[in-house]
């Protein structure tokens, strides 16, 4: 019983529950859930999950990063250009990853060292990165070696789908960081910036790190998307930044910082992805699709915030019990 209560009090539980419910609905609509469905789901949505992991890290320190979608687009066009220049699959992937990490480091420098507001800083860099992507590849197209796609859709270590391994690498890096003193410092910074400064925590270094990690996550996302579509587009990640923030909130991550974790981002992104899949498969008009997605997203965010906010929980219990 204690384990059940502990699970239900977990910040990411509402997102996990919503995902499982929609997964069941999707199974009913499609006649069942198969291994091929899960492989297709993870290969299609691994990029969104990776971006959600990255933005969650920045939100935990009471910040955000709305440039990750533009970084994904930039990675995509860099990989396309690399293949057109004759680079091999590993070389193109590493070049794309390096580009993303450098973008993340630049964000970390502006936010952490220069102390520019994270929202304003990453809004500016988002426009800059998107502009660079358009300069490199002005229109969709380009060439990506199909062996890149074959590698992505295959298995690593014999049985594990490649997208799962790529996501797991990010998760393991974050878990390792959380085991170190810096993990506690990240949550301390998110809960109270002034106290973090007063206690001697290196705030600039922490913010630099989380934005660099977010850049790495966006780089992995760019690799996933590029390998999955085997084509280039300078706007492929344009909608990912805001969706990833919504995913984090649905996953119980407080926008004020210091509450939640990357599992919330993962389950929140999974929920959004399965929601989009269900709405699209219903063959509704685009207007109705957008309305339903927005409505369910609003409900999901509201439920998650209500479930993770103790004050709101208390008010709901009082309202239900008729107490004032």
Model-based region annotation:
Residues 1-20, 24, 171-172, 191, ...:
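Cytosolic-side transmembrane-helix boundaries in multi-pass membrane proteins
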Residues 3-7, 102-144, 179-181, 245-261:
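Short loop segments and helix-boundary regions at transmembrane helix junctions
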Residues 18-34, 61, 133-138, 175-181, ...:
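Structural signal for alpha-helical transmembrane segments and their membrane-water exit/capping regions
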Residues 21-85, 110-115, 247, 252-262, ...:
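Single transmembrane alpha-helix segments in multi-pass membrane proteins
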Residues 29-41, 136-138, 177, 210-248, ...:
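Inter-helical junctions in multi-pass inner-membrane proteins, predominant
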Residues 31, 114, 118-180, 206-209, ...:
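Transmembrane helix-bundle core of multi-pass membrane transporters
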Residues 88-94, 102-107, 111, 156-232:
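Helix-loop-helix "hairpin" substructures at the membrane interface of multi-pass membrane proteins
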Residues 218, 228, 232-294:
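Transmembrane alpha-helical segments in multi-pass inner-membrane proteins
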């Amino acid at each position: 019983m204690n384990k059940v209560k502990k699970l239900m009090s977990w910040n990411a539980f509402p997102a996990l529950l919503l995902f499982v419910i929609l997964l069941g609905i999707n199974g009913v609509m499609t006649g069942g859930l198969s291994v091929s469905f899960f492989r297709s789901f993870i290969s299609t949505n691994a990029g969104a999950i990776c971006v959600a992991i990255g933005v969650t890290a920045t939100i935990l320190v009471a910040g955000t990063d709305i440039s990750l979608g533009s970084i994904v687009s930039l990675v995509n066009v860099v990989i396309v250009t690399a293949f057109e220049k004759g680079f091999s699959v590993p070389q193109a992937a590493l070049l794309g990853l390096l580009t993303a990490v450098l973008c993340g480091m630049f964000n970390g420098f502006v936010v952490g060292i220069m102390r520019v507001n994270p929202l304003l800083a990453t809004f500016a860099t988002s426009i800059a990165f998107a502009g660079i992507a358009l300069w490199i590849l002005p229109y969709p197209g380009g060439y990506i070696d199909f062996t890149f796609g074959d590698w992505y859709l295959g298995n690593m270590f014999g049985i594990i789908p490649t997208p799962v391994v790529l996501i797991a690498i990010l998760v393991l890096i974050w878990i390792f960081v959380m085991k170190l003193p810096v993990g506690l410092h990240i949550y301390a910074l998110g809960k109270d910036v002034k106290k973090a400064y007063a206690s001697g925590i290196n705030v600039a270094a922490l913010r630099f790190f989380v934005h660099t990690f977010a850049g790495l996550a966006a780089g992995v996302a760019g690799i996933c998307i590029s390998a999955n579509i085997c084509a280039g587009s300078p706007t492929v990640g344009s909608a990912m930044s805001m969706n990833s923030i919504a995913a984090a909130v649905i996953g119980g991550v407080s926008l004020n910082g210091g509450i939640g974790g990357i599992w919330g981002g993962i389950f929140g992104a999974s929920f959004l992805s399965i929601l989009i899949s269900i709405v699209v498969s219903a063959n509704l008009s685009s207007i109705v699709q957008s309305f339903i997605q927005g409505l369910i997203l609003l409900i999901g965010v509201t439920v998650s915030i209500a479930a993770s906010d103790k004050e709101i929980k208390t008010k709901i219990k009082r309202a239900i019990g008729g107490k004032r």
